[in-house]
Every structure is written in C-alpha cells, then in structure tokens.
C-alpha cells in the first residue's frame, strides 16, 4: 500500500465514532509526520479496519489479532494526546 498525503490521512481519520476521532485526529496532527514510512503504512492499514473492531481494540475489550496492528494501536493510544 502506498503512502497517502496528509490531507487524505486526516480525512480517513474521520470515523463514525467520536471516541475514535478523539484518538486519531491528535495522533495525525502531532505524531504521524514523524513516523517511519513503514509505520505510516501500518497506520493507514489500521484506518482500513472497521469502526467496531477499532473501538474494541482501543478500549481494551479485545486484542487485535494482527501483531503489527496491535503495536500501532498501542502507539496511537500512548501518543495521541499532545
């Protein structure tokens, strides 16, 4: 998967759940540009997941079955706030 420009990433972060918006928007604004290209691709992969899955992973109700995506979930949760 190729890297998206920042405007497209911001748009992809707009979800159907406010809880996810609150996590993703600050992460993109404050952290995304500093990620390695590999992690940017991984974040984009994460954004392709369905909202109910993302919500369950970020709220700790379920563990993401993909270890790479699980690492990105931890990274977003830990660094989303400024």
UniProtKB/Swiss-Prot annotation:
It is found in: Cytoplasm. One of its GO terms (cellular component) is cytoplasm. InterPro entries: SDH, SDH_sf, SdhE_FAD_assembly_factor. The keyword Chaperone applies. It comes from the Bacteria. One of its GO terms (biological process) is succinate metabolic process. An FAD assembly protein, which accelerates covalent attachment of the cofactor into other proteins. Plays an essential role in the assembly of succinate dehydrogenase (SDH, respiratory complex II), an enzyme complex that is a component of both the tricarboxylic acid cycle and the electron transport chain, and which couples the oxidation of succinate to fumarate with the reduction of ubiquinone (coenzyme Q) to ubiquinol. Required for flavinylation (covalent attachment of FAD) of the flavoprotein subunit SdhA of SDH and other flavinylated proteins as well. This is FAD assembly factor SdhE. It comes from Shewanella oneidensis (strain ATCC 700550 / JCM 31522 / CIP 106686 / LMG 19005 / NCIMB 14063 / MR-1). The gene is sdhE.
């Amino acid at each position: 998967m190729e890297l998206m420009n920042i405007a497209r990433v911001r748009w992809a972060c707009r979800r159907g759940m406010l809880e996810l918006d609150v996590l993703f928007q600050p992460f993109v604004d404050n952290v995304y540009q500093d990620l390695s290209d590999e992690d940017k691709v991984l974040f984009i992969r994460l954004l392709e997941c369905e909202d109910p899955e993302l919500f369950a992973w970020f709220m700790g109700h379920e563990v993401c079955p993909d270890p790479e995506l699980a690492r990105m979930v931890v990274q977003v949760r830990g660094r989303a706030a400024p």
